[in-house]
Amino acid sequence: MFLLRPPTPAQVAAFVARSREQAPSYAETGWSLDGRTPDWARSGRHRVRVGEGEACWERAKAALRGGQMFQDWVLRPHGEASTPLSRQGATVVLLVRHFGPWGRRKWGLYSLMTNRVLYLVDEPDRYGFGYGTLPGHLVRGEERFLLERDAGGAVWFDLTTFSRAALPFSRFAQPLVGAAQRRGARHYARMLVRAAGC
């Protein structure tokens, strides 16, 4: 859903209601959990060290659960920020500003996009989730947001993706879509590291 201004609460609510009824926009759901990539998709990976120690591990988990990696790149509009990323089956709504200034009633090109939380990882040394795109998203595919703690106590954030442009114009602009995804991965990592404060 493309808009020239940030969406109203009513627009977000209607969009969410439609999205909750939709299945993911591709067949290979859950493949990112094992690092697999369908033949039609391009894969990506971005891994950074968050810090070390038990306190860092707990803060990083809280930041991931709270969606802190989305700050300043995409927003979780209005009341949708309360949608838990730690609930399998949850529909996650993101507001992407493609260009134009941030803020209410500001011009620009915005899009609402939805993803479904497909799986959770909650193990002693691994924590995270994976979500997949729903119809109307600019791409089709998955992202896995995973924290890992190694034997020395270091905490790592590992983002893996597989995707392909989904809409006619985004297929035409696949190189730009790929560049935006790589930029997004770096941004997600930077925001998560900042939020964890290790």
From Swiss-Prot:
InterPro entries: DUF1990, UCP010260. It holds the Pfam family DUF1990. Coiled coil: none annotated. PANTHER family: UPF0548 PROTEIN (PTHR34202:SF1). Belongs to the UPF0548 family. This is UPF0548 protein DR_2035. It comes from Deinococcus radiodurans (strain ATCC 13939 / DSM 20539 / JCM 16871 / CCUG 27074 / LMG 4051 / NBRC 15346 / NCIMB 9279 / VKM B-1422 / R1).
